[in-house]
């Protein structure tokens, strides 16, 4: 949203395991589900959600353990986790439904885990790359949280991107 409001202030854009906000990428059903994630999370048995959440977001033991640790901070109140996740998904749905152009008018890099299983993130990144011509780097042996599965590779790509943007003399 910041980029939409202040495009001249952006020096570069990196998306890690994310998705475009343009409505044209989403189906009506996907938006509908985003708006209703909270009640789904509330009826999902907590222990099952812990397993699905950690395995669904990461491929490595390290990445899965980080996700599980974060989720376990809500172990005493899983409904709070559902509220927080639901809020995030609703905000995402609102941004998509705003149907703004969300133009990326600066150097950009899309990063996505080759084994990303979170929603349609992997297919969104393929389409985003094809439609907008944005560079896309696939991270081997990585899921939706590719920066926790392969932090060295993700950091290398980020550092390379920054050095290329800085080397072009783009003012910020």
List each language-model region with its residue ranges.
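Hydrophobic residues on the short alpha-helix immediately C-terminal to a glycine-rich phosphate/catalytic loop
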Residues: 2, 18, 157-161
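Flexible "cap/lid" loop of the alpha/beta hydrolase fold
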Residues: 4, 10-43
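Short, structured coil segments at secondary-structure junctions
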Residues: 9, 104, 130-132
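Active-site loop signature of alpha/beta-hydrolase-fold enzymes
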Residues: 21, 118, 145
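Conserved alpha/beta-hydrolase catalytic His-Asp/Glu region
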Residues: 24-26, 43-103
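Short aromatic-enriched loop/helix-cap "lid" or pocket-rim segments at secondary-structure transitions
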Residues: 24-29, 122-124, 149-151
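Conserved loop-alpha-helix segment in the C-terminal half of the alpha/beta-hydrolase fold
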Residues: 108-142
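Catalytic active-site module of serine/aspartate enzymes centered on a nucleophile-bearing elbow/loop
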Residues: 132-172
């Amino acid at each position: 949203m910041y980029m939409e409001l202040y495009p001249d202030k952006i020096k570069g854009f990196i998306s890690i395991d994310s998705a475009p906000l343009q409505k044209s990428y989403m189906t009506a059903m996907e938006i509908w589900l985003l708006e209703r994630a909270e009640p789904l999370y509330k009826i999902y048995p907590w222990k099952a959600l812990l397993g699905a959440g950690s395995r669904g977001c990461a491929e490595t033991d390290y990445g899965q353990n980080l996700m599980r640790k974060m989720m376990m901070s809500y172990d005493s109140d899983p409904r709070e986790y559902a509220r927080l996740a639901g809020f995030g998904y609703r905000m995402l749905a609102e941004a998509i439904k705003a149907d703004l152009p969300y133009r990326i008018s600066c150097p950009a890099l899309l990063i996505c885990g080759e084994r990303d299983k979170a929603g349609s993130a992997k297919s969104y990144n393929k389409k985003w790359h094809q439609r907008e011509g944005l560079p896309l780097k696939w991270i081997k042996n990585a899921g939706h949280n590719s920066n926790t599965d392969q932090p060295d590779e993700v950091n290398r790509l980020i550092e390379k991107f920054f050095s290329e943007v800085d080397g072009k003399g783009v003012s910020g």
